[in-house]
Amino acid sequence: MTKVGFETKNWVYTGSNLAPDKEKIEKMRKDFADKNQDTFSFIAIDKKNKKIVGSMMSSFKKNGRLRHRIGMGWGIHPDYQGKGIGTKLLKESLRYAKKKGFKRAEAEMAIENKGSWKLALKNGFKIEGEKKKALLTDDGRYVDTYLVGRML
């Protein structure tokens, strides 16, 4: 069996421990579109080996009372964490969202994923709440999450 993407225990949005590759991102886009949502994504690629080393996806409602905000999710390959890739992806995503007229950005991440919530806080997000046992991991553990948000 061939794995796609890359291993990261804290990835939330794929339903597995694999951060998405290009095909998974396209499938996620289609799934969002089927639910009256749309997405935009930014991907970091290592120039030397041409592999995806990080991704940032934002989803949004096309109409209704939630149309002013985006929900964000990201994953950075463990070998590339701490090198500013997440910061660059997040800043570019926020810049693009603001340019498109969105007013608010939100994300949810495992509390044990310190790198993720530190990235969010460093970029102006505030912790707005906690959810107990919000995620069920592939190995059967329940994980608490932070809800973070910021205005653009």
Language model: regions and residue ranges:
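A short, well-structured alpha-helix characteristic of acyl/acetyltransferase catalytic modules
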Residues: M1-A19, E23
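Conserved acetyl-CoA pyrophosphate-binding loop and the N-cap/start of the following alpha-helix
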Residues: Y80, G84-E92
